[in-house]
Curated annotation (Swiss-Prot):
Cleaved propeptide residues: 21-100
Gene expressing this chain: MMP8
Domain notes: The conserved cysteine present in the cysteine-switch motif binds the catalytic zinc ion, thus inhibiting the enzyme. The dissociation of the cysteine from the zinc ion upon the activation-peptide release activates the enzyme.
Catalytic activity: Cleavage of interstitial collagens in the triple helical domain. Unlike EC 3.4.24.7, this enzyme cleaves type III collagen more slowly than type I
Protein's recorded name: Neutrophil collagenase
Residues bearing glycans: N54, N73, N112, N204, N246
Tissue expr: Neutrophils.
UniProt GO BP: cellular response to lipopolysaccharide; collagen catabolic process; endodermal cell differentiation; extracellular matrix disassembly; extracellular matrix organization; positive regulation of microglial cell activation; positive regulation of neuroinflammatory response; positive regulation of tumor necrosis factor production
PANTHER family: MATRIX METALLOPROTEINASE (PTHR10201), NEUTROPHIL COLLAGENASE (PTHR10201:SF137)
């Protein structure tokens, strides 16, 4: 039950939510918004004034703050994309911004720190838990002068434990698939400790929640880092699986830990992957394809989804949707006849129905009839039951209905597509156009007029504007 003090707050949210959701979901969504803003954006739980003296709306301000942090459209309204973000599994520590440090910038005053594993999850062996914790600490030690030593008795700087629901630290867990874990800033007593929700399903794979990834995130808090708004950073608040073999700390997190403790003691300073910025004028794409009206833009470990009916463009890890796929997809196309998409890397390719990978893949690109000299595809596109494959300065054409590579190929790209003089990085088809991407630019090639009708920056498709 809600107290009478919260009634104006709830009425305000009901008004905002009712515009987009049926009556049956209003109360649930209202509770979601209230709980989320209280936990992560410092909305007082006894907040009953809907406006301040200067007329500003407290609820709208907090919603805008949350939307800015996650890169959503800043409306101050609990719309569908905002509610979807609020429902994602995440860390229990409140949000701030940048790779920012914890308020007050607390830090450990020494670089040799101890940790102790107080209990274990039954879902993994003790050895698997110990390995995940050790590897998680090692990420931070490689990037800084910090050294971590495990002890099995006595008082440690950082205590690690699995708890459920209320466990005496004023930050109760909420059961499966909500708040996964939380940690406390450096300090005495509970300071630095990391707690994991015992009701989650912990794994050392891509299934459910990978303990190594969550632990590495929480230890960032234990060392003094707050959440980052960089979606590629380890310190981003929402959980997303990423490939853990040979995982290295992203550059945003390296910058953060070194801002607190200084450079690594290693002779060669570590560098990590940076998250591509959608409106970087030099941005290039690895591959692009349509998918049932959406457009997917692949870059390194990520892809952007452009929705047909919405203005927003959403960025995700490839591994979040397809844990078994490699990063760095090199070519992609949608087969409209079979309602499938095909993704290529090196001499292998995968077939997907919607977002599901079909059994029996990956397969070798030699199945298409390529000579052994072709070991990778630069770009691919489907048009009128034919697939065009671009490799260096040439292209092949495959007959999908008769399933063979057409004779007379490869042909010169510049000869068949006047105005396309450079290597093709990515291409997709809309109506009677091939949208060809080469370097940071894209070329709209009219298949009827047989000429380029527009040249612009490629990331215009990510809603970027230039003067």
């Amino acid at each position: 039950m809600f107290s009478l003090k919260t009634l104006p707050f709830l009425l305000l949210l009901h008004v905002q939510i009712s515009k987009a959701f049926p009556v049956s979901s209003k109360e649930k969504n209202t509770k979601t918004v209230q709980d989320y803003l209280e936990k992560f954006y410092q909305l007082p739980s006894n907040q009953y004034q809907s406006t301040r003296k200067n007329g500003t709306n407290v609820i709208v301000e907090k919603l805008k703050e949350m939307q800015r942090f996650f890169g959503l459209n800043v409306t101050g309204k609990p719309n569908e994309e905002t509610l979807d973000m609020m429902k994602k599994p995440r860390c229990g520590v409140p949000d701030s911004g940048g790779f920012m440090l914890t308020p007050g910038n607390p830090k450990w005053e020494r670089t040799n720190l101890t940790y102790r594993i107080r209990n274990y999850t039954p879902q993994l062996s003790e050895a698997e838990v110990e390995r995940a914790i050790k590897d998680a600490f090692e990420l931070w030690s490689v990037a800084s002068p910090l050294i971590f030593t495990r002890i099995s008795q006595g008082e440690a700087d950082i205590n690690i434990a699995f708890y459920q629901r209320d466990h005496g630290d004023n930050s109760p867990f909420d059961g499966p698939n909500g708040i996964l874990a939380h940690a406390f800033q450096p300090g005495q007593g509970i300071g630095g400790d990391a707690h994991f929700d015992a009701e989650e399903t912990w794994t050392n794979t891509s299934a459910n929640y990978n303990l190594f990834l969550v632990a590495a995130h929480e230890f960032g808090h234990s060392l003094g880092l707050a959440h980052s708004s960089d979606p590629g950073a380890l310190m981003y608040p929402n959980y997303a699986f990423r490939e853990t073999s040979n995982y290295s700390l992203p550059q945003d997190d390296i910058d953060g830990i070194q801002a607190i403790y200084g450079l690594s003691s290693n002779p060669i300073q570590p560098t990590g992957p940076s998250t591509p910025k959608p409106c970087d004028p030099s941005l290039t794409f690895d591959a692009i394809t349509t998918l049932r009206g959406e457009i997917l833009f692949f870059k390194d470990r990520y892809f952007w989804r452009r929705h047909p009916q919405l203005q927003r463009v959403e960025m995700n890890f490839i591994s979040l949707f397809w844990p078994s796929l490699p990063t760095g997809i090199q070519a992609a196309y949608e087969d409209f006849d079979r309602d499938l998409i095909f993704l290529f890397k090196g001499n292998q390719y995968w077939a997907l129905s919607g977002y599901d990978i079909l059994q029996g893949y990956p397969k070798d690109i030699s199945n298409y009839g390529f000579p052994s000299s072709v070991q990778a595809i630069d770009a691919a596109v489907f048009y009128r039951s034919k697939t065009y494959f671009f490799v260096n300065d040439q292209f092949w054409r495959y007959d999908n209905q008769r399933q063979f590579m057409e004779p007379g190929y490869p042909k010169s790209i510049s000869g068949a597509f006047p105005g396309i003089e450079s290597k093709v990085d990515a291409v997709f088809q809309q109506e009677h156009f091939f949208h060809v991407f080469s370097g940071p630019r894209y070329y709209a090639f009219d298949l009827i007029a047989q000429r380029v009708t527009r040249v612009a920056r490629g990331n215009k498709w990510l809603n970027c504007r230039y003067g």
